[in-house]
Regions:
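Substrate-binding groove of N-acetylhexosamine-processing glycoside hydrolases
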Residues: 1-299
Length: 299
């Protein structure tokens, strides 16, 4: 059944291929006096997952659900409102299928700091207690008020940061993946550098990516303004805001690098190229100070 649970199939395809006959026979050998864990980190409402939970319940297995406040696929920061909708939906299914509770994992290869994961863990507490209660939007506003003394609008910078994180993941990558959860894939390759003998070619090659850079640069400025407002208005948990601030600088670094590489590729003579190289050097050197401040804040 594994392939039915982890492939993008239609409901009709799932129903057509669903077959538990081997499991129905093997269940006779399953131990009874234990708790079985049902790990599912993404959307728990997919039909295959719901059918499996019903199979557990039908066969009288003691099952505990396990969702995630952070996974290895999202370095430095969870995404999608701290995964609150996934958590809420799984908690509701736990109630409907009479499972023996639910926990939320938080993988440290996904986020280097507890503060970036905490909102997801609070969502787990919220929805495991009352899955039919607040909507995710209502939860996000309540979290802002109770954890920081801020309005939902004053915490909108965090939604923008989660969006920025997606570009950060692949900003400098053209194929494969580099991920702390499972290492570097064999197909991993970074983008090429501009060729001074072929000005403009690099820009044409990566035009789509550079268009996104301009969007992300504007997003960075928006996040900075939002963080400044939050820092001025917050009544508590200011350290969490410090963590967000440094994480925002990290997410912005590849944007700055791509911007100066585009400048270099657009130069028309040696003097302009030398000036562009100085700017590239400044950005590269700034990584050390950015990293030092990042590590100081995180530690």
């Amino acid at each position: 059944l594994r392939w039915l649970l982890h492939r993008p199939l239609t409901d009709d395809e799932i129903r057509k291929n669903w077959n538990t006959s081997r499991l129905d026979e093997a269940i006779k050998m399953f131990p009874k006096n234990c708790i079985y864990m049902r790990w599912h980190y993404e959307d728990p409402t997919v039909l295959s997952h719901q059918m499996l939970l019903k199979w557990y319940h039908k066969n009288g297995l003691n099952v505990m659900g396990a969702t995630a406040a952070a996974t290895g696929e999202t370095p430095f920061m969870p995404r999608n409102n701290s995964r609150a909708q996934y958590i809420k939906d799984f908690c509701k299914l736990v109630s409907q299928n009479q499972l023996k509770g639910i926990l939320a994992t938080a993988w440290d290869d996904a986020s280097a700091h507890w503060e970036t994961v905490m909102r997801g863990l609070i969502a787990q507490g919220e929805y495991s207690w009352h899955p039919d209660g607040r909507t995710v939007d209502e939860f996000i506003r309540a979290h802002a008020r109770r954890e920081f003394g801020l309005s939902g609008q004053q915490m909108e910078f965090l939604t923008e940061m989660e969006k920025a994180a997606f570009f950060f993941d692949q900003a400098l990558v053209v194929s494969g993946t580099r991920n702390p959860a499972w290492g570097v894939s064999e197909t991993f390759r970074l983008l090429d550098l501009p060729d001074s003998e072929k000005p403009g070619e690099w820009k044409r090659k990566y035009q789509g990516r550079l268009d996104t850079v301009r969007i992300e640069s504007a997003r960075y400025e928006k996040i900075c303004k939002g963080l400044k407002v939050a820092e001025q208005a917050a009544l508590r948990n200011r350290y969490t805001l410090d963590i967000y601030k440094q994480t925002n600088e990290l997410f912005h670094y590849p944007v700055k690098l791509l911007e100066v590489l585009e400048v270099y590729d657009s130069t028309k003579n040696d003097e302009e190229r030398l000036q562009a190289l100085v700017r590239i050097g400044d950005v590269c050197n700034s990584f050390k100070s950015m990293r030092a401040e990042f590590e100081k804040t995180y530690s």
